[in-house]
Amino acid sequence: MLKYINALRLPLAALVVFIHSYNTAWRGINSQVVDGLGTILSRTLPTFAVPLFFAISGYLFFINQQTFSWKGYVEKLHRRFYTLLIPYICWNVIAFALYALKDVSAGQLLHLPLSFNLFWGCTQVGGEGSNILGWHVIASTAPVQEPLWFVRDLMVIVLCSPLLYTILRYLKWLGLAIVAIVYYAGLWPNVGGMTLIGVWFFMLGAWCGMNKYDVGGKLARYWPICLVSFIISFGLLLGR
């Protein structure tokens, strides 16, 4: 399984770049061709990359953890402090500094005030709404460096991993099914600006890791079907 994960790292990273490449400059071009390509290459084909990254994170976090221990939990937090938190802070500080430099050079006030919210949810990503139960769902948010919402959510999930482990350990597939229903039915109200996408796919990967499922090996047997399905789906998208 690990060899498949290593092989996927670069392609998935490239797909994430595709997601964020269809920016304001491209959307400002009045062209149906550009709009169509942007929709397919940025908003359609690569959308599975981020969920898969969450699933891989969950798999790797729990692959060697059949039983929970606070010692192991603290060790994992210590490693994530250097691999997640420090880079997260640094890149958000750099982003804020660049935005501030732009405002100052234009003789304007800072449009982003200096506060903790720069590192949490100063940017609104989605829109507000209501779910099927009529509950109010607030907009999802991101830090000043918008793509790093993934890292923010992942850090929160890692902190909550003892709870997720308990759910999977004692409720097993039922706990996974409950989270899936809440996610796909849109019942989660985006508490703190966080969607449930990270929790759901992290738990899905964690479930595979805890049970040592060789997902990559099983899917490799069906690669011709996957390839044909991809070609057909891509053709249908182009024909829209």
Question: What is each residue range found by the language model?
Answer:
Residues F48, R80, L84-F96, L154-V158, ...:
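Alpha-helical transmembrane spans of integral membrane proteins, capturing the lipid-embedded, hydrophobic core
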Residues L84-D153:
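Membrane-interface helix-loop-helix regions
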Residues M155-A180, W207-I225:
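Solvent-exposed interhelical
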Residues K3-Q65, L84-N92:
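Functionally critical transmembrane alpha-helices in membrane proteins and complexes, commonly lining
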Residues F61-R80:
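Membrane-helix interface linkers and caps
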Residues I197-M203, N211-R240:
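Alpha-helical transmembrane segments and terminal signal-anchor/GPI-anchor hydrophobic tails
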Residues P11, L45-I56, P147-L159, T195-L204:
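Membrane-embedded alpha-helical segments of multi-pass membrane proteins
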Residues A14-S21, A177-N190, L227-R240:
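Aromatic-anchored segments of alpha-helical transmembrane domains
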